[in-house]
Amino acid sequence: THLAGPDKPPGWSYNPSSWIRRWLGIALAVLGFFLSRYLAAHQLGYIPHLWDPFFGDGSDRVTCSALSKSFPISDAGFGAVAYVLEVLIGFMGSRARWRTAPFIVVSFVLLVLPLGATSILLVIMQPVVVGAWCGFCLINAAALLISVPLAVHESIAVGQFLRLAYKQKKKFWSFFWLGGSALGYEGKDPDRTRWSIRQRWAASYQGISLPWFIVLQAIVGVWLMARPNILPYNIASADCDHWMGAIVVTVAAVATAEVTRTARFVNIIAGVIVLILALLFSSGSTAVLMSGIASAVLLILVSIPKGVIVERYASWDRFIK
């Protein structure tokens, strides 16, 4: 039949479109919706003040800043709508939607990635432009960073499927919109009805790992973002650390997915930039200078290891360096 075929992509050790792989991303989108809804209620004047779990009146200052008001609509409200779409798309399609409905997967990825990039950009601009932090904005950004490695696996599977269709001289756009079969391959999703809670939890983030060197990259990034508040020096140095810290954390989050583990090399470049910026803007403060040098060297060193790749991704294996 037109859509006959396996659940797992050919050559993969698991199914990135299975329901157990989707629930975590959907749950994070639901969390993002309620947080964005709360922030939007303040921006639109429905509640007078925001409660911030970490930064006092920081959320009030950020949501009412000139930066937020520069958007033609409530940025938090727009984010809430995007999260609703993310939840709806997360529920769409069968457990083999990587081949039965590729356009759904592509739509999901195109929604998650720009939303994540925008969220990170706004987080960077909070201390740089506004001079304050928004606690719920940071929680939202963290949830999005977790969603990105969860979503990227399906996009790889879709890309491989469409490439196979193209090589077989089949109608590309027909396969993109209507899906297709993968006859000749086998791979059914396992029956998880008797699985323990621990087994189900492990299956929900299959293909994602948190090796020690990725953890250290994230710690360096968080330190760079927090350094201006702990070791204040000058505005130029603080702005550089805010920008570089957010970039380092973002790259580390993307690299937690085995299919995008190669992204960690970007943090080697980031480490070199941190070193140069420390020498340029922190030379008047020994503590800030040493912090920049130590952060840069550590970041470069921990961005080299690849770690153990547990799963298999067919032709994509050769791109995991």
Each model region followed by its residue ranges:
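Membrane-interfacial helix-loop segments of redox and metal-homeostasis proteins
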Residues: 1-244, 248-261, 291, 298-299, ...
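Hydrophobic alpha-helical membrane segments
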Residues: 108-119, 265-279
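A structural feature that tracks compact, well-ordered secondary-structure segments
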Residues: 227-231, 252, 264, 271, ...
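Terminal recognition/anchoring or ligand-binding modules at protein termini
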Residues: 281-321
